[in-house]
């Protein structure tokens, strides 16, 4: 028979403490919580199917050889910046405890973060595919930026260097009205604030108290992928996609890529570049407008000269009214002059034939034929006269109409030339008025400068000192005297006051001043300086009067 271990005595088992199932579960719960407290656990999320109807989240954390149940309460889940995703490797921070209902230990997660850059990149790629499948990144959805916006809305932190860079760049290029919606750009709640700012700008009414922006800039400085993660959240991406205002994303540096860059209407590598995309350079616009104005003036000048040359050529090509009527008038005069001669010649010819025929006829027949011929001749003469007068009247009416049309054409051309001359005269008058106004402005400025110079000259003149009660003493040559030693006894001097000059002679009994050393000639600028103020009166100085 196989060897068996001896059974322990029954008496010690009877002394072991007795627990109910609930008591044992609670004891194990206290032991686990006291022994471990808060822990950080690294593992892969498994079994996550989204939040429960109660708002709590239940899943498991596992690695290659073990698994632990995890729970996130509703309030904690709502405050989390990083939400759990199935299959994502994370680092969970929470409190280790047990669930008495099934005697299983679990971790109550209070904070969740991805385990390294790889996990974040995988999550970002998954979101990118999901949003792209919804068509949020399609180029057809994107709007064109306004050429020169009146109001620019900026969503960024109000205390960072980003807003200063944007404002400075806008000031350099083309100052515009800027509205800043201050938000947190990283950390808990930052994604919600950015999305709310984008939707808030879009909710502003047209013509309201706060102007509605024409373009939006969502900006943030550079940082790590974790720092920029708020701009990868779906709430921010969807808010940017729903924006009816054209949006420029300027998150991070040129090498930083976030999901908002794919849905924005334009992506700028830096916040400064976003400001450059929003507005053109004002000086370039001034140059372009000036060039267009110059080209327009040159075009109209060329067109005006061309039309004037064509008008002059057409006027030279037109014949004079008298020349048009000269030849028809000459023909009419020739026809009128030849008509009586033709009538006479025709009458003589018929008369000769009549005479020849009359010799062959009897007197009675001859008289009858003569009477008939005379009647026919009279009728023909009347008809010929009527026809000639009618033809002459028609020709005159025709030539009168031609003359009226030619005069009207000439008057119309002359009126057009007078109108052009009047326009040029009016333009010259306007230019002269502008030149006169500029000349008046220049003269006013020069008068102001002359007046200011006169005031400065009066302030610096020695006459201002005389007006305060001082006097200027000169010798007979008119040179100012700077000391009492320079005046000999009995010398003639001239004293200038503010209101005039008087002559004076120094005391004769005053001792002569000592001989002065030869001094270097002073510059002319120093001769006009007033004598230095003396304290008291020298004992040897006599009265000047």
From Swiss-Prot:
GO molecular function, one term: exodeoxyribonuclease VII activity
Residue ranges with Low complexity bias: 515-525
GO CC annotation terms, alphabetical: cytoplasm; exodeoxyribonuclease VII complex
Annotated InterPro entries: Exonuc_VII_L, Exonuc_VII_lsu_C, OB-fold_nuc-bd_dom
Protein location: Cytoplasm
Pfam families in alphabetical order: Exonuc_VII_L, tRNA_anti_2
Region of interest (Disordered), residue spans: 499-545
Stored CDD domains: ExoVII_LU_OBF (cd04489)
NCBIfam families the UniProt entry points to: xseA
Family: Belongs to the XseA family.
Protein name: Exodeoxyribonuclease 7 large subunit
Organism annotation: Bradyrhizobium diazoefficiens (strain JCM 10833 / BCRC 13528 / IAM 13628 / NBRC 14792 / USDA 110)
């Amino acid at each position: 028979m196989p060897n068996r271990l001896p059974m322990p005595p029954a008496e010690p088992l009877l002394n072991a403490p007795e627990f109910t199932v609930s008591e044992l579960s609670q004891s194990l719960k206290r032991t686990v919580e006291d022994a471990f407290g808060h822990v950080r656990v690294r593992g892969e999320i498994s079994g996550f199917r989204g939040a429960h109807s109660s708002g709590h989240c239940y899943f498991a954390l596992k690695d290659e050889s073990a698994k632990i149940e995890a729970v996130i309460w509703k309030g904690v889940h709502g405050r989390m910046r990083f939400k759990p995703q199935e299959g994502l490797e994370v680092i969970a921070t929470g409190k280790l405890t047990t669930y008495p209902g099934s005697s299983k230990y679990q971790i109550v997660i209070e904070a969740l973060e991805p385990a390294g850059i790889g996990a974040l990149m995988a999550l970002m790629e998954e979101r990118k595919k999901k949003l792209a499948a919804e068509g949020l990144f399609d180029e057809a959805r994107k709007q064109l930026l306004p050429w020169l916006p009146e109001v620019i809305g900026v969503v960024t932190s109000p205390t960072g260097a980003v807003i200063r860079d944007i404002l400075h760049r806008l000031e350099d290029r083309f100052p515009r009205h800027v509205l800043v919606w201050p938000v947190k750009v990283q950390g808990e709640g930052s994604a919600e604030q950015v999305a709310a700012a984008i939707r808030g700008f879009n909710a502003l009414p047209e013509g309201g108290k706060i102007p509605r922006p024409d373009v939006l800039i969502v900006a943030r400085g550079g940082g790590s992928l974790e720092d920029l993660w708020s701009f990868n959240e779906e709430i921010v991406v969807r808010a940017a996609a729903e924006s009816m205002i054209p949006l420029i994303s300027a998150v991070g540096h040129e090498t930083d890529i976030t999901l908002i860059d794919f849905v924005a209407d334009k992506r700028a590598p830096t916040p400064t570049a976003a400001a450059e995309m929003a507005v053109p350079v004002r000086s370039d616009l001034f140059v372009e407008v000036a060039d267009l104005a110059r080209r327009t003036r040159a075009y109209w000048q060329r067109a005006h000269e061309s039309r004037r040359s064509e008008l002059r050529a057409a006027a030279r090509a037109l014949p004079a009214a008298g020349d048009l009527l000269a030849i028809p008038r000459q023909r009419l005069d020739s026809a009128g002059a030849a008509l009586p001669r033709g009538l006479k010649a025709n009458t003589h010819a018929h008369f000769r034939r009549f005479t020849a025929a009359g010799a062959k006829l009897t007197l009675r027949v001859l008289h009858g034929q003569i009477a008939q011929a005379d009647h026919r001749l009279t009728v023909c003469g009347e008809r010929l006269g009527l026809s000639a007068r009618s033809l002459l009247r028609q020709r005159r009416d025709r030539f009168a109409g031609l003359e009226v049309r030619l005069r009207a054409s000439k008057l119309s051309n002359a009126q057009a030339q007078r109108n052009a001359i009047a326009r040029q005269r009016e333009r010259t008058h306007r230019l002269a008025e502008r030149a006169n106004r500029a000349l008046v402005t220049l003269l006013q400025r020069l008068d102001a400068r002359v007046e200011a110079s006169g005031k400065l000259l009066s302030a610096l003149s020695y006459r201002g000192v005389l007006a305060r009660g001082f006097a200027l003493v000169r010798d007979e040559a008119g040179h100012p005297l700077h000391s009492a030693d320079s005046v000999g006894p009995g010398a003639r001097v001239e004293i200038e006051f503010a209101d005039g000059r008087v002559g004076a002679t120094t005391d004769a009994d005053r001792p002569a001043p000592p001989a002065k050393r030869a001094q270097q000639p002073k510059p002319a600028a120093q001769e006009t300086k007033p004598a230095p103020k003396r304290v008291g009166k020298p004992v040897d100085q006599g009265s000047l009067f």
